[in-house]
């Protein structure tokens, strides 16, 4: 009996820990150990989800549209750039250092500059998402290319395969696990970057709604938005995992 109980606790230790934190959090709020503007209780946040569900749904859909569009474009650009950088050594030497420099600049610092150059429409948001999502994918795929078996590359060359045949039949399959590793990071970056870009202006989106809630002192709604963004990012990463299992079938074997 005790052994079965320990086994169950080990399997569900993350859930138990999460429920424990929520319980302590709720009790601390009930006893008013923390002011509401610092940390609303889980129950208040849940009530905000129910109360503001229509607004949350509307602004979530607006954020999702921008994030998914930017992510798709970012993935396409990253894949094309990776192939070119792998084929042309001089292009890799030219672009890679600049990409590293761009990644060291905080997103919140780049966003106002893009707004200044491109206006308050959707374009600066898309560009910002592309800037943040391409780098993890490019680095991951290039790493996958570098881990290709040299003996297999030699074999393809002896069979007189051209560079595109080597890429399609060998390099791409080998680098797919690396691609998905980078895609997981880019998915989370896409949603976070979208919310950050919405802070700077606009009429819809979770970032805009968060700023509006802050001005109205609706701190429970602010926390609800934060949790919602996190859940959307986790859902996106889970979808990537599911896609990977179906695309890379040999990995399961």
Where are the regions a protein language model picked out?
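Glycine-rich helix-loop "coupling/hinge" segments at transmembrane-helix boundaries
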Residues: 116, 192-229, 248-253
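Transmembrane alpha-helices
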Residues: 127, 131, 164-196, 229, ...
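Generic hydrophobic transmembrane alpha-helix motif, especially the helices
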Residues: 100-136, 143-144
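Transmembrane-helix boundary motif in ABC transporter permease subunits
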Residues: 69-99, 116
């Amino acid at each position: 009996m005790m052994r079965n109980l320990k086994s169950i606790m080990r399997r569900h230790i993350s859930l138990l820990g999460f429920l424990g934190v929520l319980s302590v959090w709720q009790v601390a709020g009930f006893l008013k150990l923390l002011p509401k503007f610092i940390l609303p209780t889980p129950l208040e946040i849940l009530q905000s989800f129910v109360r503001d569900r229509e607004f949350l749904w509307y602004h979530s859909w607006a954020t999702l549209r921008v994030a998914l569009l930017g992510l798709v474009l970012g993935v396409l650009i990253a894949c094309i750039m990776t192939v070119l950088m792998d084929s042309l050594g001089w292009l890799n030497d030219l672009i890679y250092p600049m990409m590293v420099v761009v990644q060291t600049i905080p997103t919140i610092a780049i966003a106002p500059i893009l707004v200044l150059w491109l206006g308050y429409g959707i374009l600066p948001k898309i560009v910002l998402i592309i800037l943040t999502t391409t780098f993890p994918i490019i680095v991951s795929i290039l790493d996958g290319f570098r881990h290709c078996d040299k003996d297999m590359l030699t074999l393809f060359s002896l069979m007189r395969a051209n560079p595109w045949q080597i890429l399609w039949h060998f390099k791409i399959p080998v680098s797919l696990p690396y691609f998905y590793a980078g895609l997981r990071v880019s998915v989370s970056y896409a949603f976070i970057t979208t919310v950050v870009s919405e802070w700077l202006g606009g009429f819809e989106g979770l970032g805009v709604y968060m700023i509006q809630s802050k001005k109205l002192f609706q701190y429970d709604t602010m926390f609800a938005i934060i949790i919602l963004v996190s859940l959307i990012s986790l859902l996106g990463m889970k979808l990537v995992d599911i896609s990977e299992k179906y695309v890379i079938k040999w990995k399961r074997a």
